[in-house]
Amino acid sequence: SCHWCHVMEEESFENDSIAKIMNDSFINIKVDREERPDVDKVYMNAVQLMTGKGGWPLNCIALPDGKPVFGGTYFTKEQWSKILKDVSKLYKENPQKVEEYAQRVTEGIQTSELITLNKEEAVFKNEEIIAAINLSTEQLDTINGGFKGAPKFPMPNTLDYLLRYQYHFNKPELFKYIKKSLTKMAYGGIYDQIGGGFSRYSVDNRWHIPHFEKMLYDNAQLVSVYSKAYLQDKNELYKSIVKETLAFVNDELNANNGAFYSSLDADSKNENNELEEGIFYTWTKQELKALIKDYKLFANYYNVNTTGFWENDLYVLIRDQSVTEFAKKNKLTKDELK
């Protein structure tokens, strides 16, 4: 369901010339990380050791014994072609050098797994909890919520931890930050303002343009965080987000056999029946004017303007004020606005 996975598949793996290079010099194995998370973990660790970062699509070149020698995420067709040729040539001309490097990477992976979980029960001391919080607070984005920088992930587990911490230690300033984070995410393009549910992350630092893939595990965890926040704050926005997100999961991810689908694709078909990133979630002004009776009010509420603009005349809906604030400003009741 990842956009860049589709791009690399179309550009490289479905390209005859690239396929010939791969088939002539390599045995190609495609791993479903949902089915084999253990295999995914090994090669993700390897790529992180080699490059300092990871992600998907995850591409790894390994020796016949499975030891990784090269890896990365997305590569253009030209980059991937050169990588394949260079690695193949190096292995033919200097296999010992490649094998030595593979051994070092493998040892690095093994070293990273030397730390084992403590299975003995332990009681955390307040000092330990406070120290953990102090490490994370330096990265808090007090303007846009979430954590500093981009891309911006919701990080539901961290928000849940901070929510518990502020409740037990009575930290009003931290609670203010948490509420800002939850509100900004709910107002942002990372949240589907029409259909409910959260995308995986935003590519900018203000939660506007999402990576349009929607993950089951993200939405499940965010439902939990917003529910707990509502218990503490009784903010109707949080309650609405929980209801809308659960409705999205039930409508779009329910497999009707007792299970749920793990994700929704970032790409959907456009008017030419071609897959395009985010086209299902983005709008032109012309489309909205044809659909919305009171377009001007709608456009003001969802910032169909320079604030909400993405690219190619497309807009990602984003809010910047509450229902109450907007209704009052436009001399409407909340029911009239809805």
PLM feature spans:
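Replace the tail clause
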Residues: S1-K338
